[in-house]
C-alpha cells in the first residue's frame, strides 16, 4: 500500500495518490494531472478511481481530465449533482482498490455533498481517513463557503457539520491518520494548523470540534462568528467543478501567444484585459508598464489573483519571465482563470530595450519614515489581515485588508499623503499597483513592511491580541 500526499503550498491544498497491488486512486486532484499519471506509470499501476470530497470552491479539480486520460471512474458522495457522468456513492459504500478498501462516509456541513473516505488496509484495519474540507487539523471547514445553498443558513450547515464530525469521524480509532483537504492559509477554514497530517487521537485532544469542549449550540456560534466573506471567484469555481471545463492543454495553448511590446498596450485596450505583472515586487517597484497590476508569481499568486480580479472570465495579459509562461498559465487555471490571451514577448526586458514609457513605485525606508511618521498630514495604511493588524501595528495606522483595496470601500483620497505597508512588501506593492492603475499617484511604499518597521524607532502598539480571524 502506498499513500502520497501532494501538497500545493500556494493553494494550501492536499491531493492524495493511493496505490495497492497495481490499482490506484486519486483524491481531489489538481487540474494539472500529469503528476498523478506519472506516479501510476512508475509502478505500472492503473488509476481506477478519482474520488471527489465535494465541489471545490477554491480551485478547479482535475477529476474530469484525469478520468478522460485514464478511464478512471469519478466518484462523489451522496447529494452531489454533477452535470457529467459520475458515480454518486451511497453512505458506507465500499470501494475495492487492490488489497485495500475505501469506505464512503457522508459528512455534510461544509457543503451538503461533503464526503470523507475511510481507508482500511489489507487486513481490514482502519488506517486513515481523507476528510476533505469537513475536518482540518485544528479546525473544521467553514459552512457554505461558496454561498451555494441559499436555502440553508450557515447556522444550519454548522449544526449538520457538528453531527458529521461527532457521529461519523470521532468514533473512529485514535491511531488512524487524518489527511485533510487543506492546511493553514486556505480560505476554507479559520485557524488551521501548519501540519498536514495528524492522528485522530491528537485531534480529539486539540481540535475544538472533537474535544468535547463545546456543546452543539456553542459550536455553531463559534464557527459562524466573524465568518469572512468568501472570495467572489468561489461560486464560479464551484460551477466549473460541477458543470465541466476546458482541458488544461487547451488553456495553455490559448495563453501562449507572444505579443510584441509595440502591440501590448493596444491589445490590452482592445480586449479590456488586465496587464498582470508576475515579476518580483522589487523589480516591479523599480519599473513597470503603466497601469499594469503586480501579483508576483513567487508569492501566494493564484489565490490573490482570484480574490482581487474576481471575474474568472477577465482577459489577462502576462508580464513574466519567458521560461515561466506555462507555469503562470497553469497556476491561473488552477483557480479558474482560463482567459489568458497572451504574454509580453521576451518579457519586460524587451519593453526596456524598446525605450517605452515606464512607471515606478515610490518607496521609503522604515528608518527614513520614522522621521516623518508623526506629521499630521501623514496617512498610514496597513494592508495586512485584521488578525495581523490587531496583533501589532503602527500607532494611528488604518487597517485596509488587501482584498478590500480594489473597491476602495474606505474612500482613500487621491490628494492624501499615503504611506502603505504589509508584513514584508508583497501585498503592499499589489495594493499600490491597483490604486496606481486607478489614478492614485501619491502612495509611498514602506520597504520591508512591518518586519522593517519593528526594527526601527517607529512607535507600535505594545500588546499582542489573540484573534479568531
Identify the residue ranges that each predicted region occupies:
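Conserved beta-strand hairpin/beta-sheet module of binuclear metal-dependent hydrolase folds
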Residues: 1-46, 117-132, 138
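Core dinuclear metal-dependent hydrolase active-site scaffold
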Residues: 2-6, 16-19, 95-124, 128-129, ...
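Divalent metal-coordination and catalytic microenvironments
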Residues: 18, 28, 54, 66, ...
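Active-site neighborhood of phospho(di)ester-bond hydrolases with catalytic His/Asp-centered motifs
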Residues: 26-27, 47-56, 74-79, 106-109, ...
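Active-site metal-binding loops of divalent metal-dependent hydrolases
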Residues: 29-30, 55, 79, 111, ...
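Active-site metal-binding motif and surrounding structural segment of the metallo-beta-lactamase
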Residues: 33-75
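Metallo-beta-lactamase
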Residues: 111-230
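Rhodanese-like catalytic fold shared by cysteine-dependent sulfurtransferases
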Residues: 142-144, 155, 202-239, 243, ...
Amino acid at each position: 500500500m502506498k499513500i502520497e500526499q501532494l501538497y500545493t503550498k500556494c493553494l494550501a491544498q492536499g491531493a492524495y495518490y493511493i496505490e495497492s497491488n497495481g490499482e490506484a486512486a486519486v483524491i481531489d486532484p489538481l487540474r494539472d494531472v500529469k503528476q498523478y499519471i506519472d506516479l501510476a506509470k512508475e509502478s505500472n499501476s492503473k488509476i481506477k478511481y478519482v474520488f471527489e470530497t465535494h465541489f471545490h470552491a477554491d480551485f478547479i479539480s482535475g477529476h474530469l481530465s484525469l478520468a478522460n486520460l485514464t478511464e478512471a471512474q469519478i466518484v462523489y458522495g451522496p447529494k452531489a449533482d454533477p452535470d457529467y457522468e459520475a458515480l454518486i456513492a451511497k453512505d458506507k459504500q465500499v470501494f475495492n482498490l487492490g488489497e485495500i478498501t475505501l469506505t464512503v462516509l457522508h459528512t455534510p456541513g461544509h457543503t451538503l455533498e461533503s464526503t470523507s473516505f475511510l481507508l482500511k488496509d489489507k487486513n481490514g484495519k482502519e488506517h486513515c481517513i481523507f476528510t476533505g474540507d469537513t475536518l482540518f487539523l485544528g479546525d473544521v471547514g467553514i459552512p457554505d463557503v461558496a454561498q451555494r445553498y441559499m436555502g440553508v443558513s450557515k447556522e444550519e450547515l454548522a449544526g449538520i457539520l457538528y453531527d458529521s464530525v461527532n457521529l461519523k469521524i470521532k468514533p473512529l480509532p485514535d491511531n488512524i491518520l487524518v489527511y485533510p483537504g487543506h492546511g493553514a492559509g486556505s480560505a476554507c477554514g479559520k485557524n488551521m494548523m501548519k501540519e498536514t497530517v495528524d492522528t485522530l487521537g491528537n485531534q480529539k485532544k486539540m481540535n475544538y470540534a472533537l474535544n468535547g469542549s463545546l456543546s452543539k449550540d456553542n459550536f455553531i456560534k463559534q464557527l459562524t462568528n466573524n465568518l469572512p466573506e468568501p472570495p467572489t471567484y468561489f461560486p464560479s469555481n464551484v460551477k466549473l467543478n460541477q458543470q465541466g471545463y476546458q482541458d488544461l492543454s487547451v488553456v495553455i495553448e490559448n495563453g501562449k501567444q507572444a505579443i510584441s511590446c509595440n502591440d501590448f498596450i493596444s491589445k490590452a485596450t482592445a480586449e479590456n484585459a488586465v496587464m498582470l505583472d508576475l515579476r518580483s515586487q522589487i523589480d516591479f517597484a523599480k519599473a513597470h508598464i503603466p497601469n499594469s497590476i503586480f501579483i508576483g508569481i513567487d508569492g501566494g499568486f493564484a489565490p490573490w489573483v482570484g480574490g482581487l480580479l474576481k471575474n474568472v472570465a477577465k482577459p489577462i495579459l502576462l508580464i513574466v519571465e519567458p521560461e515561466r509562461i506555462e507555469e503562470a498559465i497553469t497556476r491561473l487555471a488552477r483557480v479558474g482563470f482560463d482567459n489568458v490571451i497572451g504574454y509580453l514577448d521576451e518579457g519586460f526586458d524587451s519593453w526596456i530595450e524598446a525605450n517605452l514609457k515606464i512607471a515606478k513605485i515610490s518607496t521609503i525606508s522604515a528608518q527614513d519614515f520614522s522621521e516623518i511618521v508623526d506629521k499630521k498630514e501623514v496617512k498610514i495604511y496597513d494592508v495586512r489581515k485584521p488578525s495581523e493588524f490587531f496583533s501589532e501595528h503602527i500607532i494611528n495606522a488604518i487597517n485596509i485588508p488587501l482584498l478590500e483595496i480594489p473597491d476602495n470601500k474606505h474612500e482613500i483620497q487621491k490628494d492624501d499623503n499615503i504611506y502603505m505597508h504589509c508584513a514584508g512588501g508583497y501585498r503592499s506593492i499589489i495594493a499600490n499597483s491597483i490604486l496606481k492603475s486607478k489614478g492614485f499617484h501619491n502612495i509611498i511604499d514602506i520597504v520591508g513592511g512591518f518586519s522593517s518597521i519593528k526594527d526601527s524607532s517607529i512607535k507600535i502598539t505594545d500588546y499582542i491580541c489573540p484573534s479568531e480571524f
